[in-house]
Amino acid sequence: MNRSMQLKRMVEDDLRHAIDNDQLMLHYQPQVSVDGSTLVGVEALVRWQHPAHGMIPPSDFIAIAEERGLIVPLSEWVLRRACTEARRWKGIRLAVNVSPIQFRHKDFVANVIRTIEETDFDPAQLELELTEGVLIEDADAAEAAMMDIRAHGVGLALDDFGTGYSSLIYLRRFAFDKIKIDRSFLEYMESTGESAILVHSMAHLGRALGLRVCAEGVETAEQHRFLQAIGCHELQGFLFSKAVPASEIDRLLRLDNPFAEILAAA
């Protein structure tokens, strides 16, 4: 049996046990104001600390969890743990990814609201990140669920913006609060003028529609300066920080200007 098959079998056998026995953990990637002065939010990202195989990245188990029907319990664990840990971080948003399978589950909205209530988390601080895949199967049902979620004060972000076929239609129809420009555009921005033009256009469109604009995958000072000049509101990427444990977010929030040294050295 090759390594990929061994990994898949191990994930199938062990992931349910990991969810039930606290072998998962969350790291949080900071989302920073465009001038780099303020931590405005964090994105919760799951990690798996396997007792025999060490740290397993999400790229090795999320897709398998979707295939094997484990993505709903996994996603519910992530949301509950994130709300529990982030409850102490006042004044910043908590972003949590929602998979298409999770979103289409009949109890999705009820589970989100129950989790918020049971963890005593402020719904105004929660932001659910949706991709185009969440919306394409049943747009009417998706719209109803989104309206219900927003009625409870929870924010919605369109993730991976610019990579799908119908993103502009979704911006017109669905009530998003934020768009996240996909990292793939930033990867080629410095080598191709077309990517820079597209990023500029997406930022302008978001602002014109009254949406917050966040650029993902920011890794260089040149990207930062460009994104600031075109009017992005928020930035996320390795220039500022990789995903870190909750204790590091605690530390960053105690600082007046947590990313000043990073930007000065860039």
Residue ranges and their predicted role:
Residues 70, 176, 194-195, 254, ...:
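Residue-level marker of structural boundaries
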Residues 6, 107, 140, 190-194:
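Short, solvent-exposed loop/turn segments at secondary-structure boundaries
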Residues 65, 69, 136, 188-194:
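Short, contiguous acidic/charged loop-to-helix segments that flank catalytic cores in large enzymes
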Residues 75, 142, 195, 199:
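Short, conserved glycine- and acidic-residue-centered signature motifs
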